[in-house]
Amino acid sequence: MTFTKACSVDEVPPGEALQVSHDAQKVAIFNVDGEFFATQDQCTHGEWSLSEGGYLDGDVVECSLHMGKFCVRTGKVKSPPPCEPLKVYPIRIEGRDVLVDFSRAALHA
């Protein structure tokens, strides 16, 4: 696995999200009570940013475009209209750095 620094833990307060870009990928970094998760940033139902236009409640992000919900831990759809899960990325914390393996996105259907 190749982990790359995506941001600092200080850039993503608890209950918030941050969009980061790597190559052509836009990825959302979520802070769920000090635990960090990385998913694709775009809702699978419409072209909408989950980090900039979503609402995080616990480990579930709601897309504000059509109110679909996803688990940020697994990418699984929690509430339609989306039917496709989000890609999730391996993530780890080293010191104050949030590291993501952008090459290993996975779907957990």
Curated annotation (Swiss-Prot):
PROSITE patterns linked to this entry: RIESKE (PS51296)
GO biological process: catabolic process
Gene3D superfamilies found in the cross-reference section: Rieske [2Fe-2S] iron-sulphur domain
Binding site for [2Fe-2S] cluster: 43, 45, 63, 66
Domain Rieske: 4-100
Alphabetic keyword roster: 2Fe-2S, Aromatic hydrocarbons catabolism, Electron transport, Iron, Iron-sulfur, Metal-binding, Transport
GO molecular function list: 2 iron, 2 sulfur cluster binding; metal ion binding
Pfam families reported for this sequence: Rieske
Domain of life: Bacteria
Family: Belongs to the bacterial ring-hydroxylating dioxygenase ferredoxin component family.
Role description: This protein seems to be a 2Fe-2S ferredoxin.
Assembly with partners or alone: This dioxygenase system consists of four proteins: the two subunits of the hydroxylase component (BphA1 and BphA2), a ferredoxin (BphA3) and a ferredoxin reductase (BphA4).
Entry protein name: Biphenyl dioxygenase ferredoxin subunit
